[in-house]
Amino acid sequence: MATGDDIPTFKLVLVGDGGTGKTTFVKRHLTGEFEKKYVATLGVEVHPLIFHTNRGQIRFNVWDTAGQEKFGGLRDGYYIQGQCAIIMFDVTARVTYKNVPNWHRDLVRVCENIPIVLCGNKVDVKDRKVKAKTITFHRKKNLQYYDISAKSNYNFEKPFLWLARKLLGDPNLEFVAMPALAPPEVQMDPTMVAQYEQEIAAAANAELPDDDEDL
């Protein structure tokens, strides 16, 4: 998607099982939602998400599948020329985490060495099934991981900031203003947030299991 301006622009491929909240997540960014384009040949919506950094603007053209993944794998055209990716699962549904290696395999088959963030969505839901200590796939594959909650905007910007730093080669890059986001539909419990952040920090220092079983 060529644009007439000089904003650095990157194709971001958003994948994961159906129902994990990918569309809800991308729609939080209001200007991206307003300016999205539908690509009929591939059946995808492309949301241009602009973020303001201390080095100027950066745009992620986020490709959202519009639910096609419910009918099997995605076509290569979805992945081709992808420059970065987010793999999403639902922390309230173990099977969506169990399928992460399949999404990762499909992704790297087409886009070999791109920066990838793994996101566990719906951490606002009290009945969390996939706990921090069981989320090890990203450590084995050198991906970044974030807990997120699309409906509360919790950690919304984190995956984009990490990817922007990788893509622009600047570990000190910062976002200087938050994009306009849809108002939170739910509130995160601060005690729960503190607990989860502690668990993630502890899990990052734990030894990895020897086998390939990720659950």
From Swiss-Prot:
Spell out the coiled coil positions from the record. Answer: none
Q: Which GO terms describe its cellular component?
A: cytoplasm; nucleus
Q: Which domain of life is it from?
A: Eukaryota
Q: Name one GO molecular function term.
A: GTP binding
Q: A GO term (biological process) for this protein?
A: oogenesis
Q: Assign the protein's first listed, main location to one coarse class.
A: nucleus
Protein's cellular compartments:
Nucleus
| Residue ranges of domain Small GTPase Ran-type in the record | 6-170
UniProt-annotated binding residues for GTP: 17-24, 35-41, 67, 121-124, 149-151
Record region (Switch-I): 36-44
By what name is this protein known? GTP-binding nuclear protein Ran
Q: Which organism is it from?
A: Brugia malayi
Q: What is the lineage of its organism?
A: Eukaryota, Metazoa, Ecdysozoa, Nematoda, Chromadorea
